[in-house]
Amino acid sequence: MSGFGGRGVDEKGFLRWLLGELGVEEDDVAYVDGLVVKVDGAAASTSRLPFQTWADFGWRNVAAAYSDVRVKFAEARLLLASVTAPDLGTAAEVVQGVREASQFFSLAYVGGDLNEGRDVVVDVVLVGWARARVGRAPRPGDVLVTIPQFGYTSLAYRFWQMGGAVVERGVEALKRPKPLWPLPPAECVTAAMDSSDGLGDVLWSMARGVDIVVKELPAPREVLEFAAERGLDVGEIVFNGGEEFLPVFAVRRDCPVESPYVSFAEVVPGEGRVWWRGEELKWRGWAYFRGWG
């Protein structure tokens, strides 16, 4: 670890440093000889929600990896999973969720590993075919499009015990995420990311060498009304959610934006900043070893 200045660095800063050391492009997937490879994982002590079963937790980790592959226009085919658990009963429940997710997403579950430990940890590897190489650096003049369903998970984190239709939509999305959204025309897309650590994280990650100006909040009316009725900051709700597993695509301005997608931001020349309502966006999403920013 020589040369790594770890003080004050979070998960994303560490990974950026590591990829630089390895000479690998910073992205959410790896491209190797026409293949796409993705690894993703989580520990229950930091990532399992109180309303998730162990099977839900297994499913969630498959969905997280699948979302990163799908947003890159790649076709995931094979799945391997490593599970750590304190007992075989818990491990079996997690594996059941992994199996159910593999069937739902049409993945061949071909193997994995099992370990004993105090925490429950799930690591998923997906391998598939890469149709094209899609990075996450948009160009000036592009517009950002997404499916306007942000905010539900934010409300679920805060109000899951309260219930209600709006909150329940977020709870269900967090228990068994299903990132099977349609893809826009590939020839129109210049960059892509999915929102797992919050929309703010996506925007700051894409704003490298360019500025991003948010024009509209990509959230449904019922989410905005729910937040307003309770005096919540709608920016916090929309930008600092997480685990939406919704796609954000940078597309050429001359391409049509068709349902279920909406245009919500513009890419302009700049120095890597994100703007909302004339001010620099203060929300940066989630990162391990830092928390919400």
Swiss-Prot record:
Q: Which residues cross the membrane?
A: none
Which amino acid positions bind ATP, per UniProt? 112-113, 136, 196
Q: How is its activity regulated?
A: Is inhibited by AMP; the mode of AMP inhibition is uncompetitive for both TMP and ATP.
- Which pathway, metabolic or otherwise, does it act in? Cofactor biosynthesis; thiamine diphosphate biosynthesis; thiamine diphosphate from thiamine phosphate: step 1/1
Q: What is its EC number?
A: 2.7.4.16
Positions binding Mg(2+) 3 in this chain are 25, 68, 194
Q: Which residues bind Mg(2+) 2?
A: 40, 68
The record's note on activity versus temperature states: Optimum temperature is 120 degrees Celsius. Activities at 100 and 80 degrees Celsius are about 50% and 10% of that at 120 degrees Celsius, respectively. Is unstable so that the protein loses about 45% of its activity after heating for 15 minutes at 100 degrees Celsius. However, the enzyme is not so intensively inactivated in the presence of ATP.
**Record-listed Mg(2+) 1 binding positions:** 39-40, 113
Q: Which InterPro entries match?
A: PurM-like_C_sf, PurM-like_N, PurM-like_N_sf, ThiL-like
The Gene Ontology biological process annotation of the record reads:
thiamine biosynthetic process; thiamine diphosphate biosynthetic process
Q: Which reaction does it catalyse?
A: thiamine phosphate + ATP = thiamine diphosphate + ADP
Provide the residue positions that the database annotates as binding Mg(2+) 5: 197
Q: Which SUPFAM superfamilies match?
A: PurM C-terminal domain-like, PurM N-terminal domain-like
UniProt GO MF annotations: ATP binding; magnesium ion binding; protein homodimerization activity; thiamine-phosphate kinase activity
Q: Which UniProt keywords apply?
A: ATP-binding, Kinase, Magnesium, Metal-binding, Nucleotide-binding, Thiamine biosynthesis, Transferase
Q: How does the activity vary with pH? A: Optimum pH is around 7.0. Retains about 90% of maximum activity at pH 8.0.
Top-level EC class: transferase
Q: How does it assemble?
A: Homodimer.
Question: Which protein family is named in the record?
Answer: Belongs to the thiamine-monophosphate kinase family.
Name the HAMAP family for this protein.
TMP_kinase
**Job description of the protein:** Catalyzes the ATP-dependent phosphorylation of thiamine-monophosphate (TMP) to form thiamine-pyrophosphate (TPP), the active form of vitamin B1.
This chain belongs to which protein, by name? Answer: Thiamine-monophosphate kinase
Q: Which species is this UniProt entry from?
A: Pyrobaculum calidifontis (strain DSM 21063 / JCM 11548 / VA1)
